[in-house]
Amino acid sequence: MATVQMYTTRWCGYCVRAKTLLEARGIEFEEISLDDDLGFRRRLLDLTGGWTVPQILIDGRPIGGYTELWQLDRSGELERLAA
């Protein structure tokens, strides 16, 4: 099974949606909360190339945020990547 990591904040509605989607598909993930990281936007940009949350990585490969996750799910690609 792939390693899925998601960078989140508690105030982010799209983070909740992404977690719900992954849980509904039975995909385990590591949630990395950035609530106490004042420099989180710089950290995200360095790690993923994006500065918004959520930022999701599958096996270390940045896939983007909720919209990209949803698109992968709709196309069936998420299941393949997460296997």
Cite the ranges covered by each PLM segment.
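Thioredoxin-like thiol-disulfide oxidoreductase module
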Residues: 33-51, 77, 81
